[in-house]
Amino acid sequence: MLENRVKTKQIFIGGVAIGGDAPISTQSMTFSKTADIESTKNQIDRLKLAGADLVRVAVSNEKDALALKELKKVSPLPLIADIHFHYKFALIAAQSVDAIRINPGNIGSKDKIKAVVDACKEKNIPIRIGVNAGSLEKRFDQKYGPTPKGMVESALYNAKLLEDLDFTDFKISLKASDVMRTIEAYRMLRPLVIYPFHLGVTEAGNLFSSSIKSAMALGGLLMEGIGDTMRVSITGELENEIKVARAILRHSGRLKEGINWISCPTCGRIEANLVDMASKVEKRLSHIKTPLDISVMGCVVNALGEAKHADMAIAFGNRSGLIIKEGKVIHKLAEKDLFETFVIEVENLAKEREKSLKD
């Protein structure tokens, strides 16, 4: 059951609203050296094209921090500076970026946090309190270990620090590398604060592993109404982080956009290379943002029944196939004409739906 979203305080990262009634945003992180502006800009461009709303960049040294001024000028996405250990890099970064992420486990003393807060106040930019189970402050780690309780106590302590400094433009993340600790931590903290949540499973692994962990943890939280922005962390291509994140948003009921793909798992009746064809169809129609149910079936035997609830379906037969629109066969074509005709029909249907929504 899809629950209503928890209403949180709204903050802004550049022009992107986080929390309140704002759509749930997606983000990723570049892996280039931030001071290499050309490479970093290219990666940000890729993320923009993939549909990302925000981007985070590592600030590992003073050179990275100083490069942010020029990077900000060319970035098509709001920039978040990721700071570990060296609070002075945050002071430099705050002059140029749209938000600062700090790890309370390694940023340092209250005085250092105050300096970061003062810099963010001056530029009117928000902070993310980025709690990680693997790098909790010593006192919380010794008392609780890398547990949900330890993460929550760290978040509450640091939220209170910022509040005492009269600073409330912040969001919170509670990241662990497994599903259960991630879910439990966010559930535990949600009723205790009004601030927006950044969701994520940290160090989640490769595309396969991360997709499963993230779908279970983030998808479950999203269905409970928890979460305002998110990152799917993948050891792999940048674009996959956004692709998987947006799929999780769609299938958790939080994003009404794009195609819901339906395809049979294959059996002895298939009369085409369905694996290749399904991949080809999905890639060719990936640009469509209109909500549609599209079915790709490996034989005509089951297609008429199984695809009847799809907006559009393609069924491959022996050197021929069917195109089915809203349960009715509209084309029976030779194999050579089937694919391109199907693409045209789906694109036309998307245009029809968009027009009807505007009218």
Swiss-Prot record:
An example GO BP is:
terpenoid biosynthetic process
**Which residues are noted in the entry as [4Fe-4S] cluster-binding?**
264, 267, 299, 306
Q: How is the cofactor bound?
A: Binds 1 [4Fe-4S] cluster.
Q: Which pathway does it serve? A: Isoprenoid biosynthesis; isopentenyl diphosphate biosynthesis via DXP pathway; isopentenyl diphosphate from 1-deoxy-D-xylulose 5-phosphate: step 5/6
Keywords of the record, alphabetical order, are: 4Fe-4S, Iron, Iron-sulfur, Isoprene biosynthesis, Metal-binding, Oxidoreductase
Q: Which reaction does it catalyse?
A: (2E)-4-hydroxy-3-methylbut-2-enyl diphosphate + oxidized [flavodoxin] + H2O + 2 H(+) = 2-C-methyl-D-erythritol 2,4-cyclic diphosphate + reduced [flavodoxin]
Q: Which InterPro entries match?
A: Dihydropteroate_synth-like_sf (IPR011005), Enolase-like_C_sf (IPR036849), IspG_bac (IPR016425), IspG_bac-typ (IPR004588), NO2/SO3_Rdtase_4Fe4S_sf (IPR045854)
Q: Which GO terms describe its molecular function?
A: 4 iron, 4 sulfur cluster binding; 4-hydroxy-3-methylbut-2-en-1-yl diphosphate synthase activity (ferredoxin); 4-hydroxy-3-methylbut-2-enyl-diphosphate synthase activity (flavodoxin); iron ion binding
Needs which cofactor? [4Fe-4S] cluster
Would the keyword Membrane be found if you checked this record's keyword annotation? no
The UniProt record lists the EC number as 1.17.7.3
> What Pfam families does the database record attribute to this sequence?
GcpE
Domain of life per record: Bacteria
Q: What does this protein do?
A: Converts 2C-methyl-D-erythritol 2,4-cyclodiphosphate (ME-2,4cPP) into 1-hydroxy-2-methyl-2-(E)-butenyl 4-diphosphate.
Q: Which family does it belong to?
A: Belongs to the IspG family.
* HAMAP family for this protein: IspG
Alphabetical list of NCBIfam families matching this protein: ispG_gcpE, PRK00366.1
Query: Which protein is depicted?
Result: 4-hydroxy-3-methylbut-2-en-1-yl diphosphate synthase (flavodoxin)
Species name for this entry?
Answer: Helicobacter pylori (strain P12)
Annotated gene = ispG
